[in-house]
UniProtKB/Swiss-Prot annotation:
It catalyses: DNA(n) + a 2'-deoxyribonucleoside 5'-triphosphate = DNA(n+1) + diphosphate; Endonucleolytic cleavage to 5'-phosphomonoester. This is Transposon Ty1-BL Gag-Pol polyprotein. The active site is at D461. InterPro entries: Aspartic_peptidase_AS (IPR001969), DNA/RNA_pol_sf (IPR043502), Integrase_cat-core (IPR001584), Retrotran_Ty1/copia-like (IPR039537), RNaseH-like_sf (IPR012337), RNaseH_sf (IPR036397), RVT_2 (IPR013103), TYA (IPR015820).
Amino acid sequence: MESQQLSQHSPIFHGSACASVTSKEVQTTQDPLDISASKTEECEKVSTQANSQQPTTPPSSAVPENHHHASPQAAQVPLPQNGPYPQQRMMNTQQANISGWPVYGHPSLMPYPPYQMSPMYAPPGAQSQFTQYPQYVGTHLNTPSPESGNSFPDSSSAKSNMTSTNQHVRPPPILTSPNDFLNWVKIYIKFLQNSNLGDIIPTATRKAVRQMTDDELTFLCHTFQLFAPSQFLPPWVKDILSVDYTDIMKILSKSINKMQSDTQEVNDITTLATLHYNGSTPADAFEAEVTNILDRLNNNGIPINNKVACQFIMRGLSGEYKFLPYARHRCIHMTVADLFSDIHSMYEEQQESKRNKSTYRRSPSDEKKDSRTYTNTTKPKSITRNSQKPNNSQSRTARAHNVSTFNNSPGPDNDLIRGSTTEPIQLKNTHDLHLGQELTESTVNHTNHSDDELPGHLLLDSGASRTLIRSAHHIHSASSNPDINVVDAQKRNIPINAIGDLQFHFQDNTKTSIKVLHTPNIAYDLLSLNELAAVDITACFTKNVLERSDGTVLAPIVKYGDFYWVSKKYLLPSNISVPTINNVHTSESTRKYPYPFIHRMLAHANAQTIRYSLKNNTITYFNESDVDWSSAIDYQCPDCLIGKSTKHRHIKGSRLKYQNSYEPFQYLHTDIFGPVHNLPKSAPSYFISFTDETTKFRWVYPLHDRREDSILDVFTTILAFIKNQFQASVLVIQMDRGSEYTNRTLHKFLEKNGITPCYTTTADSRAHGVAERLNRTLLDDCRTQLQCSGLPNHLWFSAIEFSTIVRNSLASPKSKKSARQHAGLAGLDISTLLPFGQPVIVNDHNPNSKIHPRGIPGYALHPSRNSYGYIIYLPSLKKTVDTTNYVILQGKESRLDQFNYDALTFDEDLNRLTASYQSFIASNEIQQSNDLNIESDHDFQSDIELYPEQPRNVLSKAVSPTDSTPPSTHTEDSKRVSKTNIRAPREVDPNISESNILPSKKRSSTPQISDIESTDSGGMHRLDVPLLAPMSQSNTHESSYASKSKDFRHSDSYSDNETNHTNVPISSTGGTNNKTVPQTSEQETEKRIIHRSPSIDTSSSESNSLHHVVPIKTSDTCPKENTEESIIADLPLPDLPPEPPTELSDSFKELPPINSRQTNSSLGGIGDSNAYTTINSKKRSLEDNETEIKVSRDTWNTKNMRSLEPPRSKKRIHLIAAVKAVKSIKPIRTTLRYDEAITYNKDIKEKEKYIEAYHKEVNQLLKMKTWDTDKYYDRKEIDPKRVINSMFIFNRKRDGTHKARFVARGDIQHPDTYDSGMQSNTVHHYALMTSLSLALDNNYHITQLDISSAYLYADIKEELYIRPPPHLGMNDKLIRLKKSLYGLKQSGANWYETIKSYLIKQCGMEEVRGWSCVFKNSQVTICLFVDDMVLFSKNLNSNKRIIDKLKMQYDTKIINLGESDEEIQYDILGLEIKYQRGKYMKLGMENSLTEKIPKLNVPLNPKGRKLSAPGQPGLYIDQQELELEEDDYKMKVHEMQKLIGLASYVGYKFRFDLLYYINTLAQHILFPSKQVLDMTYELIQFIWNTRDKQLIWHKSKPVKPTNKLVVISDASYGNQPYYKSQIGNIYLLNGKVIGGKSTKASLTCTSTTEAEIHAISESVPLLNNLSYLIQELDKKPITKGLLTDSKSTISIIISNNEEKFRNRFFGTKAMRLRDEVSGNHLHVCYIETKKNIADVMTKPLPIKTFKLLTNKWIH
């Protein structure tokens, strides 16, 4: 109701009074809240004038006409009752509206005066009078009274009323508009200040003096709500109040900041628009002022460009500087720096002239002695020749006289010239110089720059026979005290100080010189046209130029006033110091301080700054005249040159000389781009570009690596191409200083061919702009082409090639020609060009059958280099072809993506564009032979075998195992092609790694081959193999990559009416003998399976093994088949081609016979796991044996062993001494001591940062009350075992900050001083990985926190003492500890108990049983690692509530709140995590490894090819005796500790694929032979090469809301020393790898089955613990699975027969495993060995197998 009435009775008017106050305040630099009395009067005047112009309403009986002259009845406020504040007494609404006042505007509606609401208010006594409100109380801001047009006066106008009596406090007006809020805040703050509450209000320069009380907060809230109605508040104020309606202080602080910011910006713009400079202040001060304003505006988001800034500056120039814009009018691209350079030059010249003026001054006594003694101050003859202006010369001379009489301090240029001209000069009657000036009566001693002189120019005088100049700066070969007498036209003598040469450097690089005389006693610098004529230079006043007799223009002439001038910029400055041309008195100079001395004393500041400081007395004791400035100009301080060295500036257009000096193709720029990651091996990772300087013609070549021979091949190719195609020889090649260009091989090649290499300077990439810009342009085009076409990323270089062809054909805006035209080539025929990625149909000239479709869908890439064809990508064949046999696909909807490309590609336009080219082909078409191969050789694209073991189906469709009919034939009509078949995949399949992307020269394609064999060119032959497949399901022509890689399973839905045997062609793996298997019905299949008996013989090795998972069904373990399938679903298992199933009998469930005499598998024996696993071929595939690891170590053996087998016995010299040496090896120290970081640190900057960190740590220790500061103890009084040594350690963190930590020496702490039973717990890595995985699947927010000085929050129970820090200087004293100092044995446990108690009691958390440092409640999960916390929750507000509670007790910093929906990067416990909520998570350590590995001093990048696997099968560690010296042994063991320590850290964090190699080498840390070290180097090299790899997780999309926990187990029997087995396990949660383990079995197993049982039994306990943790954190059902590739192990687990257990140990192990499986509801399933990713944990694998097993989950 009140707000409605207010809106009815309070119309909003924007009065002029408030506007005037605002405009006045923004022009000042004072506090925006400071309203002075001077402003009050001015604002009152403006307000009165504004109000007098407003219309008034008729007067009312209730309210006077003008409330400024008559006050309404004051409010009667009763005495306080029942509390500190009075009771409210308000008029009702009807009473208020009778008088016409708004509801909140009437004084009697005020509950009590504001000063009475203040907590400082004291109730009045019986005789006290209540204060009366002023007559304008309660009126609206900028709103007139209902009866009057007068607006409410501003706060400044009422200041006198406020201060007139201490008992009167003027209330603020009522806010009526959001736009007036900031002005209202000013008045409101003044109201609070007058209410004695100013000390609780923050200002722009300081914080509040004290905290407010509850009563004061109530007062603020009440008055704010009373005078600022909510409907008139700005939105940002409402946002603050919506969070906390009592947070008035935040509103006031933000308002003050807004006012301060707005005021500063307006002041800066106003200052810039009103600049004024006339040379009265130093030029550097003016430059600093303007530069600061421009920088401040730019930082505030108001950039001022060069043109506008120069206009502001030039508009503010006056005096002699007003001619500067005229002198700069020819400069088009003028910058602020150039303009200030001219101002500085003019200022220095002006100061020099003033100093010279004071050097020649007559004394009155001299004038009395000789009335004819005077100096020449008249004008040149050219002035007097104008008869119309006879009096100008006299007036100008008078003005010059006024300037010259001003005394100025000497300057650095000509202060010593005074020595020869201080005495009066007597005129002589010689006529050596005739200047043609008329006689005047002036008695001026010296003339400064005249008002009509053009600064920085020479006056051209045709009547002068000699050239005169006032400054000695341009005189060359000067000689002092010349015997020359010079007079002017009035026969007056002109004193000459020196004679020399004036050297010119004109526009055409012409240099010439004339004689010049130096004198400071002339009005202008005169340039004699007679002397110019002597050197063949004349002045043409019609063209206003200086020119030679042949018409060559040398310099422009400027006409200013009545005279002609030429600029001094063509004068060459002299290298001779000024004193050499002056008569310097030795006694005078020796009394002055030399400038180099002052320069060094004043911190190597520049001369200009020093002089300015002396002139303004900021440096005292001596004056500016006490310094010898003669050497200031030419002085070069060597220390300044070294310490202040900067890069050179690149001048725009500096490369023009190269374009003018070289012919086309003689000067090339080159650069290399790359590498591009996550591409197949066959795709190029780099490209090298070349650009011709003159024509801008470009070439690009693909590169797979940056080796010397690869670069040399490209250089050889392009040089031969240029020589043969353009008949040109390359003379210079510009390149950067990369190792690929600076190597000796390339250097010799260039030297042999007479080519000059031009390298850029170190760290100067801008000098290589041509090549760098080209690479950037090509990459932009590449990304655009791939995005537009939807082609996979491995075709990126095709996009580069296409862009290069087009860019060479486009005209340059600068040269108006294309690069091809500059090179003399014809323009690009656009009719031969297709859009990149254009769908086409390519003719298949040699199909596999006559009824097979002849058209293959493809995508056009770019014209061929080697033929008249086009390069086309065929997704179905995984390769590119060079062909002319293609037809453009017309269907626009058959584009690569789902986007509408109608606006991008128009088929009608494309047909019209290519019509002529197609007709040309049709008219010249010849009969093609049947054996014509569409695959031609071309040098940068080729086949892409995404699935090397699958055949290339020209239909881009694989036959599904469930299809019942052969594929239907396709017609040749392109319009009938299935649109889904021409859609290219967006990403390359992860299995594409061993293929070749360059097309092969020749491939045989003979049909009906009974086997798939690898050809020399890397292709695969196609064959037809019948497959047992159901016939009931219909075949579809749509296929995808997913359908090709699906696991084959037996279908339970075979049709009963289909009993015919049908041979279905199917591809098979390479090297497999395939047979034609008749297709049968389901019943026949079951009969065959039942009646077949198990056998283990050689015949079984010829059949194919199961590539899919074979679940083992039992009533206890796997009651339903869908449960088994769900366990396998979504696991990152490798994709294998489908194979025929293996028939199994019921007897499979029986326990197989165990051969106790089975041979060691490492020596060639066959284990139990091979009993039912068929061997693909007796010969091992060549691809299985291929490896890229080139053994460069001469100690590596090549014996045929399966593993890196350690020796059976490690022999050393002095075994006991060696063990002692290991114990004495100190751990790696990554920190610095106090003396290293501060005392003896020579790096000053680093030392200062460490000192700052030191003081910060000390302050933190004192703040936390770490020790008792009240009492210091004597060392002799304290038990020594209770004294803990302490020290400061310093280190530099990964983020670049310097850290100091005061720690205790816990390593020497006495056992009696701590409880050994206490534990310092941290979160387990598996718990962290589990929490991260659940966060991804549940769309959780992840918040990372850090608690500063966490240990210091925990109290210490024991009585311990430490020595004080070094800065206290009390070495003999001790202080008692009160807090848990870092380094103490009990500090970690104390902190854990402290934070655990706080989280449980104050935050409502509970710790998960069995998992320390994992806390949870119904909404939030917390993982604690010492002082780091990671919070997980569905709702971010839940995390914020926990943070607020933590901040109440601890200094908590939010490292990453995790509120963004985009990708967020974390650094959690060493893991670099990239997380996009609801999509993916990537875990890696690239930055950390990039920083740490180079510090290990490992020889990275050894000779040989890049490693593709961490180890090589067939290598083992030699058993040779280790003979080492003791010191050498210590050093090598220390090195092994560092290397294996880092590798273990990385492996157990996320690189689980390396754990086998890490575990094997870790067993040899005490056996550091050369072979072991070399193998360790190879492992570190592989980690370095793959440091960018990441553990990839994607959000799971389960069919049912359940969690799936799976462990995959494997064992390698007897492959470790003493026939121990290696076991490995990988744990997966919802398809994401969360952990792995590889270790040597603790017991010796006697068979592979026993080893597998041991591996499984080791994995079950952790599997159960993880299951409990998952159920605690996520209340969903959980499915637990156990996968193994040992069928015999599965049969033992599910069998009830114990008779065949051969020993007690084996039986008890198996029985326990049975109980665990049944009791924990584990689903045990079989997984084929080829798909068992845990295989990488137990043995070294070939490269192909290693990649196949790991590329799905780490890449």
